[in-house]
Amino acid sequence: MLQAYTKAMVKPAERIARIEPYFFADLGKRIAAMKGKGADVIRMDIGSPDLPPPGFILEAMFKSASQPTTHGYTLGQTQGFRNAIAAYYQKRFGVKLDPRTEVIDLIGSKEGLFVLSQVLLNPGDAALVPDPSYAVYSMGAQIAGGNVHLIPLLAKNAFLPDFEAIPETALKRAKILWLNYPNNPTGAIADLAFFKRAVAFAREHDLLLAHDNPYCDVGFNGYRAPSLMQVPGAKDVAVEFNSVSKTYNMAGWRVGMVVGNAEVVKFIETYKSQQDSAIFAPLLAAAETAMLGDQSWLNERNRIYQARRDAVVDVLHAAGLRAEPPQAALYIWAPVPGSEGSMDFCAKMLEDTAVSTTPGVVFGAHGEGYFRISLVGEEERLREGASRISEWMQKRGLI
């Protein structure tokens, strides 16, 4: 009786009841079941780097972890890492940041992406969110009680937003404009001229510009992505999120950062003071070492990613699928041949070929018609996956 009563009484808050299950969690369960039955599944879906960080980063963590004083909370004790972030931005982008007021550490950048909406949006306020995009931009706004106005990212515009097409009614309610370049999932890039226009647009319409920049150090053929903070006056209207996950092969370590507008940085810091107890000191030591240490190894790491990209694209092109090779990030954004929806297309592909890719519609309605291939895995495995995909599409008469 008590159990039945408890079940009847416990109901989720409305803000949580609207949340759908995370796509990759459900996909992971399906793949585990297939592997349990002996399937040789090739994962080309989630963008989790498979390469380890170099030894000097690991050694910094081990050294810190061996000290008795590092096994405690680090609240108020992360200034060393914030100094390292500022030093990285100065050296990498030529951007001067005050590490005391314009920088804060995050338990992974995803935490900050979510928290930003919580500290800025009141019920009825709006966030301008690219479509397709990383789901946390929209979900953070919705959980905060805000509304989401989607901005289409179209191939004809090189997957850049058309600011002039945003309705005035949406602009009047909007407080945040999200950007992400190099882009997930499309692999598109943006130059400083675009960022200058974005800063001017944000200033004109009293918006906070939020730029998610975790792929800035994953580039091909010598490409190096800029930072929004390089635009003069950007700190007046913008913040930028970054992470050690993709740059330093430290996905899962959960160490990120936000830099820029001092007032917004303070809002996030205040929220976090009630939410968490900061990052484990040995992880901070490793991240600090990564950002201040030798960066030359990134060239070889990017060469590996580029070779993977070229291998997959070559196989797809040989089969007749026109997938554009990206200049940055970890993804190939490929068109779904035929009229099948991307969700059904990828589900059928997994069932028939044991190759897992991501349906474009997972990233938004304007992702329909595409599927995303992640370049995380050994080159030969990725080549094998691309071959299975190509043969499967040919057998179905799609290419």
Predicted regions and their residues:
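Conserved core segment of the aminotransferase class I/II
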Residues: 6, 230-231, 235-303, 310, ...
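Active-site phosphate-binding strand-loop segment of PLP-dependent enzymes
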Residues: 149, 153-222
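N-terminal small-domain helix-loop-helix segment of the aminotransferase-like
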Residues: 10-108, 115, 291-293, 393-399
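Conserved glycine-rich beta-strand-loop-beta hairpin in the small C-terminal domain of fold type I
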Residues: 288, 304-313, 323-335, 367
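Helix C-cap/helix->beta junction micro-motif
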Residues: 37, 144, 204-205, 319, ...
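Conserved PLP-anchoring active-site segment centered on the Schiff-base-forming lysine
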Residues: 119-141
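PLP-dependent enzyme catalytic core of the Aspartate aminotransferase-like
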Residues: 4-5, 339, 348-358, 363-399
